[in-house]
Amino acid sequence: MAEETAEKPVVESFQLDHTKVKAPYVRYIDTETGPHGDVISNYDLRLTQPNKQAIPTGGLHTIEHTIAVLLRERIPGYIDCSPFGCRTGFHLLTWGTHPTEEVAKALKESLEFIAYKATWDDVPATTEKSCGNYRDHSLFTAKEWAKQILEEGISSDPFERKVV
């Protein structure tokens, strides 16, 4: 293997002290400005306490598909919301920047819908044609986790509980 001389890129989420955060929360991570001045913001939507809990893949997958629609309806400039590999939450990308309180309220409303109103018909893209792992969904698990997250309250700050 050739000797590496270039510095390795810094991955922000690997710099976060996961022992200090208090989930569930919304955390503003960073903003990037593109070559044409377009601004994209990245948020950490942490649903469970790192290294203490992880949402099973079927439930997380169903939450992912459902909030793809629900957050898009609630957050102007929504681009994407993708799950963390550790299964404790999601990265949310938006055009422009939104206060964490606004994002936390949108997340709360979305989880309330999942927990108390959603039916299988509300979960989009659950067929072999529309999903890369369509058999790995669980609305029951998504509902149970959404209820638990809502009971704990979603904070607009990762280190100090400021529940919205």
UniProtKB/Swiss-Prot annotation:
One GO molecular-function entry: iron ion binding
UniProt catalytic activity: S-(5-deoxy-D-ribos-5-yl)-L-homocysteine = (S)-4,5-dihydroxypentane-2,3-dione + L-homocysteine
SUPFAM superfamilies in UniProt: LuxS/MPP-like metallohydrolase
Record-linked InterPro entries: LuxS_sf (IPR037005), Metalloenz_LuxS/M16 (IPR011249), S-ribosylhomocysteinase (IPR003815)
Binding-site positions, Fe cation: H61, H65, C131
Keywords: Autoinducer synthesis, Iron, Lyase, Metal-binding, Quorum sensing
Cofactor(s) recorded in Swiss-Prot or TrEMBL: Fe cation
Enzyme class: lyase
Example GO biological process: quorum sensing
EC number: 4.4.1.21
Any one Pfam family match given in the protein's UniProt record, by short name: LuxS
Cofactor binding summary note: Binds 1 Fe cation per subunit.
Superkingdom assignment: Bacteria
Subunit structure: Homodimer.
NCBIfam families linked: PRK02260.2-3, PRK02260.3-1
Family: Belongs to the LuxS family.
HAMAP family in alphabetical order: LuxS
Protein function: Involved in the synthesis of autoinducer 2 (AI-2) which is secreted by bacteria and is used to communicate both the cell density and the metabolic potential of the environment. The regulation of gene expression in response to changes in cell density is called quorum sensing. Catalyzes the transformation of S-ribosylhomocysteine (RHC) to homocysteine (HC) and 4,5-dihydroxy-2,3-pentadione (DPD).
Name assigned to this protein: S-ribosylhomocysteine lyase
Organism: Bifidobacterium longum (strain DJO10A)
Gene: luxS
